[in-house]
Swiss-Prot record:
Its main location: secreted. Residues 1-24 form the signal peptide. It comes from Ovis aries (Sheep). This is Insulin. Heterodimer of a B chain and an A chain linked by two disulfide bonds. One of its GO terms (cellular component) is extracellular space. Residues 57-82 form a propeptide. The gene is INS. Transmembrane segments: none annotated. One of its GO terms (biological process) is positive regulation of protein secretion.
Length: 105
């Protein structure tokens, strides 16, 4: 019984020093392989939605150059189009586990 009374305060101190699980993943910048690893962690067996497309595959290279130069198709006074992808959300900005779950299958 004496050993038990010595271990209780030690275990209590260890419990206080351990990081809280809720704070283990705070909103973070996640880029490249770190972003992919976080998606694997969050999505698990469900997998995640990933279809890489370079801008040149979607539209011709001249269109992108004209938009950057302010030529036809640049959007007029509206400004640049808003990007809503996971890279813009989690790498350029910060995202949470709940936001990452939106990209799971």
């Amino acid at each position: 019984m004496a050993l038990w009374t010595r271990l209780v305060p030690l275990l209590a101190l260890l419990a206080l020093w351990a990081p809280a699980p809720a704070h283990a993943f705070v909103n973070q910048h996640l880029c490249g392989s770190h972003l992919v690893e976080a998606l694997y962690l969050v999505c698990g067996e469900r997998g995640f939605f990933y279809t890489p497309k370079a801008r040149r595959e979607v539209e011709g290279p001249q269109v992108g150059a004209l938009e950057l130069a302010g030529g036809p198709g640049a959007g007029g006074l509206e400004g640049p189009p808003q990007k809503r992808g996971i890279v813009e959300q989690c790498c350029a900005g910060v995202c949470s586990l709940y936001q990452l779950e939106n990209y799971c299958n």
